[in-house]
């Protein structure tokens, strides 16, 4: 009971301080200062006080770590300061290259024949978790968000409050008006094992690795589920207002990264203890070698080390590229490799009929994941590996994500082992497989193949095509397996009563799907063309073709009778022209188009599209023949808006960078496309430069 000499507000404040300090000692310092029974008694006392008087409830109360109803979803929020990713180095040479570039940028003299100049660095472990941005106002946690695209993330404050190692109130007497902390949420290995054991007992599928489990947990709508998984957090970056200086009883403002880590620890955060102050490049290399060897002894997953310039003022001088700070780099561990016994070769059939060989082998742990399958890409790769039954193969996770077979230990091959060859018949429909002389891919050419049909349907309803919400892979599989759908057109003849009888289809979802199918009939002609899934015709080419040929009829006539009209379209070559000719000349496809027309799908540009194209053609075309690639998040333009502006001026937007790319338009958190552009010396524009180019 609250002592009579202390008012409820004072007692509540006292309890908050006692409980928060006890939690900090237990979860952050790992030095318990309060017995569990005492903590529970004080916690209940605070809970009772807050229940009697809601005005005593504050955001930093320990009772607010878990509570509230499950969320309906997560709002997108803009980061005060962009949460950028880091550039990667995969070997010492790439690390040295980064170090030399940074030294030159900072005005240090460099010479390949002499030792590199000394730059004070801080080495930190790269925790394999999920980056978080924590926002504090006047010392109280007011928002937590995921990285997202670097400029905007998802607001997950209720979930992050459940992480005991994240303080709800900072240990500062005079906190700044705002403060930003960045760090990594993660699930320790032992906790991850316990989670998967519990999931196994419930019959749930096990998480593949701690990182995936952490990401999925942070996006749970119910904070109680998040709390049950006991996430942890290491802080590693601090942002303070430029004019803020510490007052009495608070630690001085840090002037370098090493001091910033100590400052974060002093105000209540958990900081990874395995950091080091590194005097020069040799020290950086030694730090990496140490943890490359010892990382498996750690109680959490790490996929490399992060090296940061120590001096914060020099960090500011070095600045940022479009997607990453110049003053930091992540040095990644080499991809893990492991041997396993090959069990069999199987095949997967894609939408175009392409057959992808897959190696199935005894499950092995690899880079935190259990792996038992890896793609072999095509028949050429199978021949190169010369796979035999019972072979011991070497599997690697490329970029620690995608499993691939990189070799065979022939000295371990069993006596009398038989050469493994790809099947000559389709595993789905038992039709003969075909391989063209100039192609590496083997294909099923049976248009009625269930695998091709499933892929065709998925493509037709995909976001880039007709965008039919509610028609997912599971429902498509049911419809195909039951023989209810044999073509795209059959989707539009499905009755509500039939759809409602499918697994997980209620009356509401059925009604929504019927509405979505009807709405898809009026989608633009270029989306319909792309949705047909004609080999080699992607979104960009479909848009260009639809602009030149305003209907399926005019396109078919040109494809079959005047292919030179097809190749006159910018970006369309002989390969696409031949593919169009073959597609439109196929009787089954002609029947499909006729049936779609009968069902109300126009397969031609409507008046608005024609008017838009006419308006564009009347403009002065300034970017004819220029190709663009968009990457990252632009300040005010969405990607679709930027693409529309470029295309309105006669330019073309592609998805990948090549030596033929004219410009790469890069925003915040630009990815590998920017790296490739710099390597190929392609001109890189920001949004302002793009708009100037368009205006000219």
Swiss-Prot record:
Q: What catalytic activity is recorded? A: NAD(+) + (deoxyribonucleotide)n-3'-hydroxyl + 5'-phospho-(deoxyribonucleotide)m = (deoxyribonucleotide)n+m + AMP + beta-nicotinamide D-nucleotide
Q: Give the EC number.
A: 6.5.1.2
Residues binding NAD(+): 36-40, 85-86, 124, 147, 184, 308, 332
Domain named BRCT: which ranges?
A: 618-696
Q: Which residues cross the membrane?
A: none
InterPro entries from the xrefs?
BRCT_dom, BRCT_dom_sf, DisA/LigA_HHH, DNA_ligase, DNAligase_adenylation, DNAligase_N, NA-bd_OB-fold, NAD_DNA_ligase_OB
Name any cofactors this protein relies on: Mg(2+); Mn(2+)
Q: Per the record, GO CC terms?
A: cytosol
- Per UniProt, the enzyme's principal EC class comes to ligase
Q: Which Pfam families match?
A: BRCT, DNA_ligase_aden, DNA_ligase_OB, DNA_ligase_ZBD, HHH_2, HHH_5
Residue positions annotated to bind Zn(2+) are 426, 429, 444, 449
Q: Which keywords does UniProt give here?
A: DNA damage, DNA repair, DNA replication, Ligase, Magnesium, Manganese, Metal-binding, NAD, Zinc
CDD domains, per database record: BRCT_DNA_ligase_like, LIGANc
Name the residues annotated as catalytic in the UniProt entry. Answer: 126 (n6-amp-lysine intermediate)
> Gene3D superfamilies, alphabetically?
5' to 3' exonuclease, C-terminal subdomain (1.10.150.20), 6.20.10.30, BRCT domain (3.40.50.10190), DNA ligase/mRNA capping enzyme (3.30.470.30), Helix hairpin bin (1.10.287.610), Nucleic acid-binding proteins (2.40.50.140)
Q: Does the keyword Amino-acid biosynthesis apply?
A: no
GO MF terms listed in the record are: DNA ligase (NAD+) activity; metal ion binding
Q: Which GO terms describe its biological process?
A: DNA repair; DNA replication
What does the protein in this record do?
DNA ligase that catalyzes the formation of phosphodiester linkages between 5'-phosphoryl and 3'-hydroxyl groups in double-stranded DNA using NAD as a coenzyme and as the energy source for the reaction. It is essential for DNA replication and repair of damaged DNA.
Family label:
Belongs to the NAD-dependent DNA ligase family. LigA subfamily.
Name used for this protein in its record = DNA ligase
The record lists the organism as: Prochlorococcus marinus (strain MIT 9313)
């Amino acid at each position: 009971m609250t002592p009579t000499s202390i008012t409820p507000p004072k007692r509540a404040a006292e309890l908050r301080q006692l409980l928060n300090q006890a939690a900090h000692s237990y979860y952050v310092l790992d030095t318990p200062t309060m017995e569990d029974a005492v903590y529970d008694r004080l916690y209940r006392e605070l809970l009772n006080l807050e229940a009697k008087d809601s005005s005593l409830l504050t955001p930093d109360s320990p009772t607010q770590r878990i509570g509230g109803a499950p969320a309906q979803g997560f709002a997108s929020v803009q980061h005060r300061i962009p949460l950028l990713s880091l550039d990667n180095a995969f070997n010492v040479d790439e690390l040295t290259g980064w170090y030399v570039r940074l030294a030159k940028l900072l005005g240090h003299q460099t010479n390949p024949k002499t030792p590199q100049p000394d730059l004070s660095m801080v080495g930190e472990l790269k925790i394999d978790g999920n980056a978080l941005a924590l926002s504090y106002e006047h010392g109280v946690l007011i928002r937590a968000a995921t990285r997202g695209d670097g400029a905007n993330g998802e607001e997950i404050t209720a979930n992050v409050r459940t992480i005991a190692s994240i303080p709800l109130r900072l240990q500062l007497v005079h906190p700044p008006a705002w403060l930003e902390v960045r760090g990594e949420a993660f699930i320790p290995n032992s906790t991850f094992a316990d989670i998967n054991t519990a999931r196994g007992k419930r019959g749930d599928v096990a998480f593949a690795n701690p990182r995936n489990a952490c990401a999925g947990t942070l996006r749970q709508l119910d904070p109680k589920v998040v709390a049950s998984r006991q996430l942890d957090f290491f802080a590693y970056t601090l942002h303070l207002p430029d004019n803020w200086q510490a007052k009495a009883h608070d630690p001085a403002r840090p002037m370098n990264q090493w001091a910033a880590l100590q400052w974060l620890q002093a105000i209540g955060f958990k900081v990874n203890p395995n950091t080091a102050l590194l005097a020069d490049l040799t020290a950086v290399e030694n730090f990496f070698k140490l943890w490359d060897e010892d990382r498996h002894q750690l109680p959490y997953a790490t996929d490399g080390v992060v090296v940061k310039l120590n001096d914060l003022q020099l960090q500011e001088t070095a600045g940022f590229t479009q997607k990453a700070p110049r003053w930091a780099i992540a040095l990644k561990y080499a991809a893990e490799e492991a041997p396993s016994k090959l069990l069999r070769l199987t095949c997967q059939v894609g939408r175009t009929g392409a057959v992808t060989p897959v190696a199935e082998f005894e499950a092995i742990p690899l880079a935190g994941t259990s792996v038992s399958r890896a793609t072999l890409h095509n028949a050429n790769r199978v021949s190169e590996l010369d796979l035999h039954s019972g072979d011991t193969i070497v599997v690697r996770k490329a970029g620690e994500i995608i499993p691939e077979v990189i070799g065979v230990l022939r000295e371990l091959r069993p006596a009398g082992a038989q050469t493994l060859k790809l099947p000559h018949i389709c595993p789905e429909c038992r039709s003969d497989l075909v391989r063209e002389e100039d192609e590496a891919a083997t294909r099923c050419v049976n248009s009625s193949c269930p695998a091709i049909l499933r892929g065709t349907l998925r493509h037709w309803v995909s976001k880039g095509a007709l965008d039919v919400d509610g028609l997912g892979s599971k429902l498509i599989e049911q419809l195909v397996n039951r023989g209810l759908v044999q073509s795209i057109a059959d989707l539009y003849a499905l009755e509500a009563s039939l759809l409602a009888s499918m697994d997980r289809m209620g009356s509401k979802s059925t009604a929504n799907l019927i509405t979505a199918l009807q709405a898809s009939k009026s989608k633009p002609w270029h989306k319909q063309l792309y949705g047909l899934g004609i080999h080699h015709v992607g979104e960009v080419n479909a848009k260009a073709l639809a602009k030149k040929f305003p209907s399926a009829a005019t396109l078919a006539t040109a494809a079959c009778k005047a292919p030179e009209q097809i190749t006159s379209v910018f970006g369309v070559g002989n390969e696409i022209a031949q593919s169009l000719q073959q597609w439109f000349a196929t009787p089954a496809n002609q029947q499909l188009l006729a049936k779609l027309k009968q069902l109300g799908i126009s397969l031609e540009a409507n008046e608005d599209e024609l008017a838009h194209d006419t308006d564009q053609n009347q403009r002065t075309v300034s970017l004819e023949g220029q190709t663009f690639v968009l990457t990252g998040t632009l300040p005010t333009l969405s990607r679709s808006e930027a693409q529309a502006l470029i295309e309105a001026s006669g330019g073309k937007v592609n998805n990948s960078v090549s030596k033929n790319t004219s410009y790469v338009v890069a925003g915040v958190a630009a990815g590998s496309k920017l790296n490739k552009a710099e390597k190929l010396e392609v001109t890189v524009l920001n949004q302002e430069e793009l708009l100037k180019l368009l205006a000219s």
